């Protein structure tokens, strides 16, 4: 088995999909989990205004709508969480995503004061964070807030990790990578677009240039620039196609270096890293 085949198998990517079937799989997954655990009253997700959170949020709300219809009461909810750091450049996209998803409820928590306080406390202790690490601080603060809201509402936290993100490790460990359920795991980037198109999402929410927007020295830095490889190349690789040698080596290097992100904390019994 080649490394490419191993990665595809691990991330459960299919070369082609039926969008309606994948939508149904994700909705049923969320419903089954909620029904299995009596303490679950709904789902929580941070909404950034990008493709991945818009898709995951819409799937969650559809699952909640079906659950409530089945039980004949408003037992379940989906809470969409806005988590800007100060003023967000693409705030209108965030509002458009909320309008499209139509969540049961929403909260807005500006994380700037909390992040800045943490950065200041570390500086006072003699630890000066660089811009990249401060970006990770933002991602972890956002996830911390989501878990607090989930705890107070009987919710579980959803993540937006998908195959094109998982292969590169392009997320913050214990930040956006730290969630309870990952409804779109198995899909690559273009397949996520297919689902949103099927769900009649406003096109600009899934055709915009993807960016994590965590770094202040490089605001709105496109993912593809940060990674040095295009999502089309990543998706082609995940679908089993041949891609040029340079991006292939880059992707496989990312995958091998980020294995720790796809595992629980490592114990003496783990050997994958050796």
Curated annotation (Swiss-Prot):
GO terms for molecular function: ATP binding; glutaminase activity; metal ion binding; NAD+ synthase (glutamine-hydrolyzing) activity; NAD+ synthase activity. Mg(2+) binds at residues 52, 165. It is an enzyme of class 6 (ligase). Gene3D superfamilies: HUPs (3.40.50.620). Pfam families: NAD_synthase (PF02540). Keywords: ATP-binding, Ligase, Magnesium, Metal-binding, NAD, Nucleotide-binding. GO terms for cellular component: cytoplasm. It catalyses: deamido-NAD(+) + NH4(+) + ATP = AMP + diphosphate + NAD(+) + H(+). GO terms for biological process: NAD biosynthetic process. Its EC number is 6.3.1.5. CDD domains: NAD_synthase. NCBIfam families: nadE, PRK00768.1. Catalyzes the ATP-dependent amidation of deamido-NAD to form NAD. Uses ammonia as a nitrogen source. Homodimer. This is NH(3)-dependent NAD(+) synthetase.
């Amino acid at each position: 088995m080649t490394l490419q085949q191993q990665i595809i198998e691990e991330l459960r990517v299919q070369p082609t999909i039926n969008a309606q079937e994948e939508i149904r799989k994700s909705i049923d997954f969320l419903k089954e989990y909620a029904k299995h655990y009596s303490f679950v009253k709904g789902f929580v997700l941070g909404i950034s205004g990008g493709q991945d959170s818009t898709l995951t949020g819409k799937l969650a709300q559809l699952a909640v709508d079906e659950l409530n219809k089945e039980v004949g009461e408003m037992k379940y909810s989906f809470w969409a969480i806005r988590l800007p750091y100060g003023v967000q450049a693409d705030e209108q996209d965030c509002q458009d995503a909320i309008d499209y998803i139509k969540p049961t409820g929403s909260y807005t928590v500006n994380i700037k004061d909390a992040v800045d306080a943490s950065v200041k406390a570390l500086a006072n202790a003699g630890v000066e964070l660089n811009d990249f690490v401060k970006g990770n601080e933002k991602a972890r603060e956002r996830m911390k807030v989501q878990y607090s809201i989930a705890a107070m509402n009987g919710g579980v936290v959803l993540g937006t990790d998908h195959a094109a993100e998982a292969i590169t490790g392009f997320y913050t460990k214990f930040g956006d990578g730290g969630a309870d359920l990952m409804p779109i795991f198995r899909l690559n980037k273009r397949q996520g677009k297919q689902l949103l198109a099927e769900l009649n999402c406003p096109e600009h929410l899934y055709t915009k240039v993807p960016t994590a927007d965590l770094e202040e020295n490089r605001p709105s830095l496109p993912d593809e620039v940060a990674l040095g490889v295009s999502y089309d190349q990543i998706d082609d690789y995940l679908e089993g196609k041949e891609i040029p040698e340079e991006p292939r080596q880059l992707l496989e290097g990312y995958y091998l270096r980020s294995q720790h992100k796809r595992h629980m904390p490592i114990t003496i019994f783990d050997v994958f890293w050796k």
